[in-house]
């Protein structure tokens, strides 16, 4: 999988260099004056968005957020804008009255939720252009309660190959652990995967930066308290390359892990656990089951870049072949599949890499290029029945969607646009009525690779020109 346009860099060592975390109190930190899903919520609150896709289930549903509704959407205004001219690929994490986010410059920020003022910042790595482009932080942070100290802690991966545990209050370093250190001469290892915190462990995927070259992909499990490496899973045999884990690990109701994987080497794209959704034991990372994309559906650069979503006793993910696959968690057999968008050809038609939002009733998809009523559109937003994938409604967009949609309890879906269409209005975050597919508002700004999130009665987004906060004007 070649990771998108302006946000790319690249890949490859043949062996994974992994070491346990080491505690240290040094680093570049500047502060201003002044676990499981349950563990994540304990550190945050019902008004927060504490992790990528709102937690290990990856449902992107903020049930308690009801300020932004179909009626109030017309009164949504920009409250603040931080970091003008700075690109952000990671999505905002909101917890305890602050927004946590890393930038393409390598700086990780804690911003005041109501004003955007910088409360603290820490440099966590930036990779210069080598065989891929220059890149900073792409992974979204998780805020969760440390199982030993019971203090709120921020977990985030840096471009320098480390997983960081930071004090939530001032971003001081608690520990850091090696994921996989990038080469000095090629853009090999890079962490796109946002850390998943569950049951005292942290799970992180290992991937290349942009397939130049491929690396041996996998998943690493760490102790949440110390950063010690507990287990590792590789997608391809020792000595082989491929099977990057670009996405983030999902956790099912029973605690089992679900991982979506990238393509194998060109000579065998289905090597090992490549092009698969894999079920892993949460303690040992032993393989408990696998669904692999049928060979007939494997094309050029078609792999899983989207993170899995848990749908009751099922789990699913969209492949870059444009198809969403829903599986029975117990048997890992296919329940149904449906086409969301066109197959990707190295991003030329966009990519189906957004995880659908799920509110317990319907699945809401943001898609890449597709044809609706005989007309080709750059993207779409769709609602589908979780039982069989049947289309409930579909709304064409003049931009493709890369960031995952999110939904609040007030009845509004936020869909970030990324791929612009020549001659069309600027890309935007679309506010959509989930009952009908009606576009309620366009919050226009830059290209949005990240997910827009609902927290504290507001909406937070990030794009190629900074971080934004949106609220309902009284």
What are these regions, as identified by a protein language model?
Residues 29-70, 474:
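Sequence/structural signature of beta-propeller modules
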Residues 45, 64-86, 94-101, 106-137, ...:
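Extracytoplasmic/lumenal domain signature
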Residues 1-27:
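Secretory targeting and sorting signals
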Residues 7, 23-33, 37-41, 141, ...:
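N-terminal compositionally biased, intrinsically disordered segments and leader/signal-like regions
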Residues 9-13, 56, 63, 114:
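N-terminal functional modules and adjacent low-complexity/disordered segments of proteins
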Residues 20-30, 227, 389:
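Generic low-polarity alpha-helical segments
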């Amino acid at each position: 999988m070649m990771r998108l346009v302006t946000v790319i860099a690249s890949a490859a060592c043949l062996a994974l260099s992994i070491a346990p975390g080491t505690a240290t109190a040094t680093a570049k930190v500047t502060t201003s004056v002044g676990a499981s899903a349950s563990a994540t919520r304990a550190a945050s609150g019902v008004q927060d968005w504490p992790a990528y896709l709102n937690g290990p289930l990856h449902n992107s549903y903020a049930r308690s957020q009801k300020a932004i509704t179909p009626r109030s959407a017309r009164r949504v205004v920009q409250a603040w804008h931080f970091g003008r001219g700075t690109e952000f690929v990671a999505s905002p994490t909101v917890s305890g009255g602050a927004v946590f986010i890393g930038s393409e410059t390598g700086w990780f920020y804690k911003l005041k939720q109501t004003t955007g003022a910088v409360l603290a910042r820490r440099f966590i790595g930036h990779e210069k252009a080598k065989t891929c482009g220059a890149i900073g932080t792409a992974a979204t942070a998780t805020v969760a309660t440390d199982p030993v100290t019971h203090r709120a802690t921020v977990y985030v991966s840096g471009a320098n190959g480390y997983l960081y545990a930071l004090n939530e209050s001032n971003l001081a370093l608690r520990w850091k652990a090696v994921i996989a250190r990038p080469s000095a001469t090629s853009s090999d290892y890079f962490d796109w995967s946002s850390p998943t915190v569950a049951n005292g462990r942290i799970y992180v995927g290992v991937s290349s930066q942009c397939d130049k070259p491929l690396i041996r992909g996998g998943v690493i499990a760490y102790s949440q308290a110390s950063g010690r490496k507990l287990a590792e899973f590789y997608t391809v045999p020792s000595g082989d390359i491929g099977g990057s884990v670009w996405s983030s690990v999902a956790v099912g109701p029973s605690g089992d892990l679900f991982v979506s994987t990238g393509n194998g080497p060109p000579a065998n794209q289905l090597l090992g656990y490549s092009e698969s959704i894999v079920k892993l034991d949460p303690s040992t990372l032993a393989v408990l089951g696998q669904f692999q994309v049928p060979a007939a559906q494997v094309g050029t650069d078609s792999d899983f870049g989207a993170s899995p979503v848990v749908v009751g006793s099922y789990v699913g993910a969209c492949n870059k072949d444009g198809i969403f696959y829903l599986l029975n968690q117990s048997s890992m057999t296919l329940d149904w599949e449906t086409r969301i968008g066109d197959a990707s050809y190295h991003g030329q038609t966009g990519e189906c890499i957004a995880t659908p939002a799920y509110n317990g009733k319907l699945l809401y998809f943001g898609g890449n290029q597709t044809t609706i009523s005989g007309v080709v559109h750059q993207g779409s937003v769709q609602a589908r029945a979780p039982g069989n994938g049947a289309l409930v409604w579909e709304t064409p967009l003049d931009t493709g969607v890369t960031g995952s949609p999110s939904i609040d309890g007030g009845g509004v879906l936020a869909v970030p646009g990324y791929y612009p269409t020549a001659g069309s209005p600027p890309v935007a975050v679309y506010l959509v009525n989930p009952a009908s597919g009606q576009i309620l508002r366009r919050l226009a700004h830059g290209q949005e690779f990240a997910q827009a999130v609902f927290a504290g009665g507001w909406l937070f987004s990030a794009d190629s020109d900074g971080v934004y906060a949106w609220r309902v004007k009284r």
